[in-house]
Structures are given as structure tokens and as C-alpha cells.
Swiss-Prot record:
Keywords: Sporulation. This is Small, acid-soluble spore protein I. HAMAP family: SspI (MF_00669). The lineage of its organism: Bacteria, Bacillati, Bacillota, Bacilli, Bacillales. Belongs to the SspI family. InterPro entries: SspI (IPR017525). It is found in: Spore core. Transmembrane segments: none annotated. Its main location: other.
Amino acid sequence: MDLNLRHAVIANVTGNNQEQLEHTIVDAIQSGEEKMLPGLGVLFEVIWQHASESEKNEMLKTLEGGLKPAE
């Protein structure tokens, strides 16, 4: 991912409160536009970098559960 894109995404949300961050995430997901995926990736990177090992394990369990094939 281009470093400039990473910085631009972070600059766009720096200082946002939880409600604003949630709106950004929900809007990006609901839009279904692939151009939003890099931004969501940057936000996930920030979450991952600031998460404890316990929180990382919980995220991985959630991700694994969400990616299991339908039975």
C-alpha cells in the first residue's frame, strides 16, 4: 500500500470521536465500493497495532468465525 495513502487516511480521521469513526467505517462497508478497502485496511492496521495480545486473539477468532464456509 502506498505510504502516502496510509498517511492521507490517517490524516482524514485524526481527531475524530468514536461516533465519527463508526460512521466512517459503516459508510465504507455499506457503500460496497472497492475503493474504500484500502482505507478500511489502514484503520484495521491502527487497531491491530494498538491492541493487546488478548484483543488480537479475539479479533482473530471473530475473523475466523466470519470466514468459515456455510454448512
